Amino acid sequence: MEPILALLLALGPFQLSRGQSFQVNPPEPEVAVAMGTSLQINCSMSCDKDIARVHWHGLDTNLGNVQTLPGSRVLSVRGMLSDTGTRVCVGSCGSRSFQHSVKILVYAFPDQLEVTPEFLVPGRDQVVSCTAHNIWPAGPDSLSFALLRGEQSLEGAQALETEQEEEMQETEGTPLFQVTQRWLLPSLGTPALPALYCQVTMQLPKLVLTHRRKIPVLQSQTSPEPPSTTSAKPYILTSSHTTKAVSTGLSSVALPSTPLSSEGPCYPEIHQNPEADWELLCEASCGSGVTVHWTLAPGDLAAYHKREAGAQAWLSVLPLGPIPEGWFQCRMDPGGQVTSLYVTGQVIPNPSSMVALWIGSLVLGLLALAFLAYCLWKRYRPGPLPDSSSCTLL
């Protein structure tokens, strides 16, 4: 009987007697408020004959946040973490008093998810991390992580220990946290899924909030043949904002020259110039009036040699030397579509050093041949037997 009575008191006005009522709006016993937002809780009391008196009590109740109206008091919650706690409204008619408590929970759950790595590569074991920033509350009772394959949890993923760290805040007294969940992934098969998703859920009284972040998976564009030392397997990485390509060895294979997508906006394409030792060509076959230019390269674009001519732009390493590992990006205007290429670090042979090495080897060979001829001449020339101790090394 007591639980039913408590539920009735929480859900509606309290019918005390003829001409009397005690009401709290919103009537829920627990209220969740987003940090930085405001909420007003109205507590009212009506009496038939006596004067109605209403008061708010609770943890650090600031009278400046209570607005007094005839027969009611309005409590304003400012959405600060200090507002978290229980507030009690007390109403009285003459000698009779009644009360209703409200538990206020201020939460912070911005859409600030960070996932690493930026993309997944099929065929290898990997660790995926998902970090939610500026979170409160951060306990496991209210915050949970999931690694999804579509709408289902990814089978075989091993969840590692969750890490929690306090965020640096400009305003003191605001203990927000960053929470990181890591998973050890099994080797993704081929063909792989287009993407995995990190999903973070905050569950509060009568409120469930969810944020999700996409982790693209590199898709092989070549036929499933065994890899060799003379060919590399290019990958295409697609996302909702940009189209990116990645290759594990540009020195032995040209990038695919077919359009990355046959639908939607036209994107520029990146190729390796086979006529140069190492040169990238970005071009756009998107009609007249378009231009392309390089916008990103490992290190600094100033360290590369650039040539741009309308819908074509070339980029090469100058001077010859090791190629930094990282992303190369080309942009097309108008439209702003970009294409990115990931290149692993490699060393380009220097022609001058190759010539010097060849000449040095030739000179050493000639010296060795001359030494051998000298020793044979001393051993087999007519006359007394010579001392051949100097040629024993042969």
UniProtKB/Swiss-Prot annotation:
Localization of this protein: Membrane
* Record bears the keyword RNA-binding: no
Sugar attachment sites are 42
Keywords from the UniProt entry: Cell adhesion, Disulfide bond, Glycoprotein, Immunoglobulin domain, Membrane, Repeat, Signal, Transmembrane, Transmembrane helix
Q: How does it sit in the membrane?
A: Single-pass type I membrane protein
Q: Enumerate the Cytoplasmic topological stretches.
A: 375-394
GO molecular-function annotation terms? Answer: integrin binding involved in cell-matrix adhesion
A GO cellular component entry from the record? plasma membrane
**What SUPFAM superfamilies does the entry give?**
Immunoglobulin
| Principal place of residence | membrane
The tissues where this chain's protein is expressed are given as: Detected in Peyer patches and mesenteric lymph nodes but not in spleen.
Top-rank taxon of the source lineage equals Eukaryota
List residues in topological domain: Extracellular.
20-353
According to the entry, every stretch annotated as the Ig-like domain falls at: 20-107, 108-225, 256-345
Concerning InterPro entries, the annotation shows: Adhes-Ig-like (IPR015169), ICAM_VCAM_N (IPR003987), Ig-like_dom_sf (IPR036179), Ig-like_fold (IPR013783), MADCAM1 (IPR037413)
Q: How does it assemble?
A: Homodimer.
Spell out the protein name for this chain.
Mucosal addressin cell adhesion molecule 1
Q: Which organism is it from?
A: Rattus norvegicus
| Gene that encodes it | Madcam1
